[in-house]
Amino acid sequence: MLIIENDQDIRHVIEFILQEHGLDTLSTPEPENLSEIIPFAPDVILLDEFINSRPGHRLCKQIKHVAGLKHVPVIILSTANDIELIAAECEANDHISKPFDINDIVDKVVRMINHTSIAY
């Protein structure tokens, strides 16, 4: 489970809660490049739409076109009103609106992990 969130407080809360639910997590405000993500082989990527150097939807689109990552489910987090459209355009598997209910994040992440493990 990889969390890409530029807000340190939000990132730490999400990471703590997911770890409390038994999930292995790695978090970063933003990866320098996609090759950093591949060795970690995350089950799911939770991606903030508004990271520092580029929009999250661009990073999502890049992830979905990298051989070692394209099968990894991506969940976009955003305050944008058009989050459903953004998620669809960048090929994200799901989306969560901010402010969010932490239980919604846990439920969606666990569902994605279970779905992915069944598919592979």
Language model region names:
Residues 110-120:
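The C-terminal output helix
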Residues 5-6, 79, 98:
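Acidic di-acidic motifs
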Residues 7-26, 32:
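Two-component/phosphorelay signaling modules centered on CheY-like receiver
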Residues 58, 80-96, 107:
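Alpha4 helix (beta4-alpha4-beta5 surface) of REC/receiver domains from two-component response regulators
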Residues 57-70:
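Short amphipathic alpha-helix used as the core "switch/output" element in two-component signaling
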Residues 41-47, 51:
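Active-site beta3 strand of CheY-like receiver
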Residues 75-77:
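Hydrophobic/aromatic residues positioned on beta-strands within the core alpha/beta folds
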Residues 100-110:
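C-terminal output helix
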